[in-house]
């Protein structure tokens, strides 16, 4: 009877997992035009925002230096540029447009993520009964396994998340989160996260193995340590 109830619950879990991608794709298409019109209307009175100004100014100085160098190579006597040449002006406008697109990307992804989070929270709340049934079935399935198989699965999960090669996976994950949210990558934050989070997670898993599994099945803990130390 529990297995029959677990199948709809499992399908509901698959639906929840796939829901964010479907919602993100749908709302990206719906919100993109509206956000673009709103942003362009808001930016119609100014070409550069305060956020863009520093980046564009740095790029302008680079272009101006390149232009002066080019004039010196051509042996023109007047190498001091009073006004930006047309090519540099076009480059500045192009940089402003690129920055605008970046800000639109951030706003669009932030909006869709908020909507996804709201829908996902509602789905968890409305499907609480199905998730409880699925959780009880998974626990029953796990407890019915012999201790060797349990130890194998526990070791597989722990090595997957906190093993030697897991740091690369965590780095890819946080980079994906930054890219999805439209944030500027920060290598310092990436390094701190990759160095600290797996260690914290490993400590929590060891605590769970020692204190929780030891009460459930001492032989399971012995088998787990024998396999991990082999």
From Swiss-Prot:
Q: Which Pfam families match?
A: CemA (PF03040)
Drop me one GO molecular function for this one: proton transmembrane transporter activity
Please give the InterPro entries that the UniProt record associates with this protein: CemA
Q: What is its main location?
A: plastid
Tell me where the transmembrane regions lie.
Answer: 7-27, 106-126, 145-165, 181-201
Q: Determine if Transport is one of this entry's keywords.
A: yes
Key words, A-Z: Antiport, Chloroplast, Hydrogen ion transport, Ion transport, Membrane, Plastid, Plastid inner membrane, Potassium, Potassium transport, Transmembrane, Transmembrane helix, Transport
> Which locations, inside or outside the cell, does it occupy?
Plastid, Chloroplast inner membrane
According to its UniProt entry, the protein's GO biological process terms are: potassium ion transport
Organism superkingdom: Eukaryota
What PANTHER family does this protein map onto? Answer: CHLOROPLAST ENVELOPE MEMBRANE PROTEIN (PTHR33650:SF2), CHLOROPLAST ENVELOPE MEMBRANE PROTEIN-RELATED (PTHR33650)
Q: Which HAMAP family match?
A: CemA_PxcA
Q: What's this protein's function?
A: Contributes to K(+)/H(+) antiport activity by supporting proton efflux to control proton extrusion and homeostasis in chloroplasts in a light-dependent manner to modulate photosynthesis. Prevents excessive induction of non-photochemical quenching (NPQ) under continuous-light conditions. Indirectly promotes efficient inorganic carbon uptake into chloroplasts.
| Similarity field | Belongs to the CemA family.
- Protein name as it appears in the record: Potassium/proton antiporter CemA
Q: Which organism is it from?
A: Oryza sativa subsp. indica (Rice)
